[in-house]
A protein has these predicted regions:
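RNase III-family endoribonuclease catalytic core
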Residues: 1-167
């Protein structure tokens, strides 16, 4: 258990010896309406963005949420630094619920496509192909290819240690 706590602190947060937590990341920038529309237009989707907050929430890692930071502060008896100028404020929620929904939708679309595209193939073949298509690394490369990587909102430590924007 103690190892897990140490690992979490190392991955998500800079906790200074003085008991100050600094999750703020100057690399974070919120997705704006024009960027969303330009990405969609690039792929032939012409849609007016009515709920920008939904697109922004889809980019927020748990390490940059108010609830997560509050939990760390309470658990480790630390305080948080004030939000430095130019840094995105801590967010109310992360992408996790949207990811759950998106994974289900993506899997349904892929399964339907494969089922119709390969009518004579076995379930094993279809399952294997689905697994290779619905893959974290493939989806991360796709996100980077379309330019979403620069809009991932995460703690500074996570960004520094895992080079998350590069992966």
């Amino acid at each position: 258990m103690a190892v897990d706590v140490i690992a979490e602190r190392a991955v998500y947060h800079d906790i200074e010896a003085s008991g100050i937590l600094n999750p703020f990341n100057k690399n974070n920038k919120l997705l704006d309406k024009n960027k969303v529309q330009n990405i969609l237009k690039k792929y032939g989707i012409f849609k007016n963005i009515n709920n920008l907050e939904l697109y922004q929430e889809a980019m927020i890692h748990e390490s940059y949420t108010k609830a997560h930071i509050s939990e760390i502060c309470l658990r480790d008896n630390v305080t948080i630094v004030e939000n430095p100028d130019g840094c995105v404020l801590l967010q109310n929620s992360s992408y996790e619920r949207l990811e759950f929904l998106g994974d289900a939708i993506l899997e349904t679309i892929i399964v339907s496509y494969l089922f119709n595209r390969f009518p004579d193939q076995s379930e094993g073949f279809l399952a294997s192909l689905k697994v290779s298509l619905v893959n974290r690394n493939i989806l991360a490369r796709l996100a980077k290819h379309i330019g979403l990587d620069e809009f991932i909102i995460m703690s500074k430590t996570l960004d520094d240690l895992q080079h998350a924007r590069q992966d």
